[in-house]
Amino acid sequence: MAKLTKRARMIAEKVEARDYDVNEAITLLKELATAKFTESVDVAVNLGIDARKSDQNVRGATVLPNGTGRDVRVAVFTSGDNAEKAKAAGADIVGMEDLAAQVKKGEMNFDVVVASPDAMRVVGQLGQILGPRGLMPNPKTGTVTPDVATAVKNAKAGQVRYRNDKNGIVHATIGRVDFDNDKLKENLEALLAALKKAKPSSAKGVFVKRISLSTTMGAGVSIDQATVAAV
């Protein structure tokens, strides 16, 4: 408990209730990241949408220019030539009914699921298993596609999927504390650019209302939007 108290005290002393220049914020977060593992750097973006309205929900995916720092395992539901293309692109597991049987047994050693359109007849039976885990393939995130090879490459390259929660906030990981500041900023700006492009036509007023950065075990730091190029 003493360690938690010490960490909380350090955060309270160093984090001010103001908007930080993005570079200053990243430097501060790194200073506060004292966990015994390499912490992720996460962003929360408050959007000016009414999340209760389906036509204002924001969902999609984008490849971060510097990746996320994670090794991503990709499972692909497909067959024939597409199966060979998926393997060549780096897929970790490829199959159809055999892969579905593994999932039903609870054997899910993967982080992303991709499916070709013809495989959705098989994947559709797994909705209650994959859905709650955020693994269900979806055309909006590019994970239901005839071009499974590109989807695999994107996932391996550091693609992040985003979706607003019930409060209209998008949460995503943009890297780790051992990334250079410039790389984290580039990743943040790439995500913000993707969100801006995904703005629903029915959303009125200010779209990006607030941006805050945090690490896995750290406090949130509010970002001055004028210091981020994509906003």
From Swiss-Prot:
Keyword set, alphabetical order: Repressor, Ribonucleoprotein, Ribosomal protein, RNA-binding, rRNA-binding, Translation regulation, tRNA-binding
Keyword Repressor: yes
Gene3D superfamilies named among the record's database cross-references: 3.30.190.20, 3.40.50.790
Coiled coil: none
GO MF annotation, one: rRNA binding
Transmembrane portions of the chain: none
GO annotation, cellular component aspect: cytosolic large ribosomal subunit
BP terms from Gene Ontology: regulation of translation; translation
UniProt superkingdom: Bacteria
Subunit structure: Part of the 50S ribosomal subunit.
Family, per entry: Belongs to the universal ribosomal protein uL1 family.
Protein's job: Binds directly to 23S rRNA. The L1 stalk is quite mobile in the ribosome, and is involved in E site tRNA release.
Name used for this protein in its record: Large ribosomal subunit protein uL1
Lineage, highest ranks first: Bacteria, Pseudomonadati, Pseudomonadota, Gammaproteobacteria, Alteromonadales
